[in-house]
Amino acid sequence: MVEFSDAILEPIGAVQRTRVGREATEPMRADIRLLGTILGDTLREQNGDEVFDLVERVRVESFRVRRSEIDRADMARMFSGLDIHLAIPIIRAFSHFALLANVAEDIHRERRRHIHLDAGEPLRDSSLAATYAKLDLAKLDSATVADALTGAVVSPVITAHPTETRRRTVFVTQRRITELMRLHAEGHTETADGRSIERELRRQILTLWQTALIRLARLQISDEIDVGLRYYSAALFHVIPQVNSEVRNALRARWPDAELLSGPILQPGSWIGGDRDGNPNVTADVVRRATGSAAYTVVAHYLAELTHLEQELSMSARLITVTPELATLAASCQDAACADEPYRRALRVIRGRLSSTAAHILDQQPPNQLGLGLPPYSTPAELCADLDTIEASLCTHGAALLADDRLALLREGVGVFGFHLCGLDMRQNSDVHEEVVAELLAWAGMHQDYSSLPEDQRVKLLVAELGNRRPLVGDRAQLSDLARGELAVLAAAAHAVELYGSAAVPNYIISMCQSVSDVLEVAILLKETGLLDASGSQPYCPVGISPLFETIDDLHNGAAILHAMLELPLYRTLVAARGNWQEVMLGYSDSNKDGGYLAANWAVYRAELALVDVARKTGIRLRLFHGRGGTVGRGGGPSYQAILAQPPGAVNGSLRLTEQGEVIAAKYAEPQIARRNLESLVAATLESTLLDVEGLGDAAESAYAILDEVAGLARRSYAELVNTPGFVDYFQASTPVSEIGSLNIGNRPTSRKPTTSIADLRAIPWVLAWSQSRVMLPGWYGTGSAFQQWVAAGPESESQRVEMLHDLYQRWPFFRSVLSNMAQVLAKSDLGLAARYAELVVDEALRRRVFDKIADEHRRTIAIHKLITGHDDLLADNPALARSVFNRFPYLEPLNHLQVELLRRYRSGHDDEMVQRGILLTMNGLASALRNSG
């Protein structure tokens, strides 16, 4: 019998020491020491010796706890009754250290990458260079590649998150520290203008220390919009055009007779300001603010780049001869100061026309405008054509090199960003659509009780209405606040499409989509606001309708719903009008909350297989949109591995995925890191589309059958926990979920409805609360029991069954990804600290009943991971993360202890502003340190 004894289990709360070469990590540790020393000096100078000595004592004791030299209860006693005015600087010190440690780790990853490249080591998986090498070996023909990459799109979609609330000042300061540490890593002691790097670091860390990390007021959607847009100027404006251009050139060089990637492959998106599901704060004004701010940001970028180009392209007509097209373009500028500088005059014409465009489409006017009274550009394509004229002319007189830098990036940028910057998705819950459509139908006299109709009659009625051009209601209709609000939001979306182009609002996503009528109801609402017309031979539908299948049951039924949608001739004409593309979104968060980690992941995989089959049989092109959170419990984990883990046919040259929370800052705040992450998305998409990456071959069906069984067992185990009497009370008492809702964290309510049901709780607070309390339950619970039961069930021997699972781990990217992501969560969990949170549960019997189940399953899951993978260490396959976890654990320790202490005070009535601020600071500090907490 396979032994699951304590001998192979890590003790709860133990640090799993990793075998990491000290030589490789010494530069990173040196960077951390440097930043930590400067932070300590700043703390002493600003807060005095008493606070410094206390922070240093806490740091030393934290390391002693990790080495098991003292008991955790000793550390807890340090904070019991600690004056809040001393607790706050301790929290701030360790939170700041987490930010600075993140900087050091990011710099070290770059350092190691360059070392490996310089040493001529094999290309790293997830890099485009490695992907091109794999494609070269595959010897694919042009027709296959051209067909597979038709309409290829990789779209990271930025979404709001309550813990990613760093103020712009903190963001900018952290970026400056990163730039300085990069110079330091390159061996410099001074900046380009001769200033001491260490002195500049001290200045920036002092600024950071004297700047509030969090806002006192509740985060507004306008703040979240600004947070999302900051990443464009930080990195994306430059990196996305670079990657798009390089990928297109690389693929066309390999298959020159195929017309590949006619459009940009990387196309960013956003939900911030368009996601209304459970968030009444998203109104028509917010949609206008989101789309208008995005347009302002991109037009301002273009104007600034054109101004730079005017300074750079100073060639004189006395020395070069331009093309007739360039001369014609320049002729519209009569500026005598640059009379013999045709490129400057041409660029001033372009800037003048773009200034007229800004005046036409923007409420707020950006800098660098030029009022020449010229007509505005009606489309981004017109702007691209003028930039092409400049490029073509430069190439005729030996100046192609000058066209290959800023001008090329600007031209490429206009091709992807247009006048809209990023596509803003609309999202709302299907229940809301039903209620509004029922009201519209009743007002129009078409049916007085639509909600009472069975599904087939609903579909018949809605199809008939969609075939009729006239709207259901007019401006004078007396509608409810809900209906007026929903129609106003869509009217604002229609206005954005009119001003900025159809790419401004590309999709409408239906949360909790469970039927064909749920899809058609959205079509009715789009029709009411001028965003859909299916009455004629040429349907108009600039906004695609994307059903979102979220629960495990809905994922199971998704393919049948898609097939029924496509069986409707009217809906099929809408799909044809959109290039035969149909997008379907898959929800990882609610499926996880519904059935647990393993069951949810397998439900998504099975849903993808079925959806791909429907697409193949009906002849449409399927684009899957993955609603992944930052955490493993919400579908997170390394994107490259996650994409390769998709089933055959599921990527199909195109995918979208959400990017959330601290993950956005970790991936896109710096150009080098942003490039690496965007490269990995494109690389995985190309490999999944063009190569056989599943690796199962004829064994696929037997592997699927195993996962069917294990996922069912995992769902049952998870259900036993969440259905334990009193579980909701335990969850609310042993985590900060209540405080997430009551304090100023995010603008969105923590529940979709005003209930205490887990089913109604939003996924982000569910996962965030378990992360803060270091249980990380959504990322692993139920998996250990499921595999243990399956191994014991026969008919093969237990050792044979373990070997079968080990073989799947070796061969199957999906299975390997599931276990690897789970291991990352388990490594960051700490049941010793979780026990401290459990002490907040007043009912001792309830505490023991639930916590003992969690602790037993935690041990069991670590044990089964070891058996299947053969690895003693959870992070044996990810040494970089192993280093990160090991290095930062001692600095997480005091943040968790202080959070428990302050939660106890807050709940006992000590709810003064300082205690609330302390709780908020611990939440943000832990989120920064864990880097993917929600």
Swiss-Prot record:
Enzyme class: lyase
Catalytic reaction(s) noted: oxaloacetate + phosphate = phosphoenolpyruvate + hydrogencarbonate
Keyword Magnesium attributed: yes
Cofactor requirements of the protein: Mg(2+)
Gene Ontology MF annotations: magnesium ion binding; phosphoenolpyruvate carboxylase activity
Domain of life of the native organism: Bacteria
One Gene Ontology biological process: tricarboxylic acid cycle
Keywords: Carbon dioxide fixation, Lyase, Magnesium
Keyword Signal appears in the UniProt entry: no
Enzyme active site: H161, K593
GO cellular component: cytosol
EC number in record: 4.1.1.31
Gene3D superfamilies: Phosphoenolpyruvate/pyruvate domain
Recorded family membership: Belongs to the PEPCase type 1 family.
PANTHER family registered for this protein in UniProt: PHOSPHOENOLPYRUVATE CARBOXYLASE
Summary of the function given for this chain in its UniProt record: Forms oxaloacetate, a four-carbon dicarboxylic acid source for the tricarboxylic acid cycle.
Cited NCBIfam families: PRK00009.1
Name of this chain's protein: Phosphoenolpyruvate carboxylase
Lineage: Bacteria, Bacillati, Actinomycetota, Actinomycetes, Mycobacteriales
